[in-house]
Amino acid sequence: MSELLFMGAASGSAVGDENLGPRRYMLALTNTDRVHRERAALSFAEHLAAYAKSHSEAMADKGFIYHSTGPPATNCARRSKATKWQLGGENVGVGGSLESLEDAFMASDPHRKNILRRVYDHAAVGIARADDRIWITVIFYG
């Protein structure tokens, strides 16, 4: 699992394509990077999106990024058994736009590995906004 902090100026849209919604727009950005590198596109894991969002909200409330641990992660692990995960990963970050966050993830080796790992076939995206910044949790599994 990896974490990332980028707070540079926003580039492009701060909330993503309004037609997709910000969570699905972030997944579209991730899938574009995957497909350009001959990986299969990820499906949106709606059943974990609320958990990912609650983690993003908790990070925004505390003012720093961290990986999910403790009871929520235990709950996530229980869900993983129900969905038959073999492997899971998580990218967390804070920044000015979804595009800049995806660019930062791809520029960081551990985050890029999570995005491009071939075994992953699903991802959940949780987004919170606070103080003109976007806090994000992306959970990958396959």
Predicted segments, located by residue:
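Functional surface patches built around histidine and acidic residues
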Residues: M1-G142
